[in-house]
Amino acid sequence: HSQDSVKACADYVTASNEEDGVALAVEKAIIAEVRAAEIPLDQLNAQARHALMGNLGIQYTYADEDRVEATMPVDHRTRQPFGILHGVATLALAETVAGLGSMILCQPDEIVVGMQVSGNHISSAHEGDTVRAVATIVHKGRSSHVWNVDVFTSTNKLVSSIRVVNSVMKKR
């Protein structure tokens, strides 16, 4: 029986231990049944270090069913050639916080995918600053969630106001 268990676990492992292969297996086999609301923010941040979030320096700082917050540095990864925050990085930050918010609201047998992101860039953030995204739920339906995400500079100047629509689907 232990050989069958090891074989089943090996079917999940798609990367070496150096690439978090074991962590990936545990995530797929065990953590998949855990609600996002039950996972500490530091663990969510650590899991994302090799994903877009990690590449952009995004860190979750607060999360509950009504609000999610995260920060992102304005640096070589997230700025335009002119030294100001890139609009697409801002939209990625918004979709990230709204995505976690929807995952917190979902049941373990559901997944969330982004359907629409639209934003208005109101002012700029400059290299060296850290922006903060605040996502609040506008609509929580059975099959979709709508989030408003405001992005602020470290001095609380509004940079962007973004609307994110997520689709809620049953896992296959």
Regions found by a protein language model. Name each.
Residues 1-36:
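Mg2+-dependent phosphoryl-transfer enzymes with acidic/Ser/Thr/Gly-rich catalytic loops
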Residues 34-172:
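Terminal targeting signals and extreme-terminal segments of soluble enzymes
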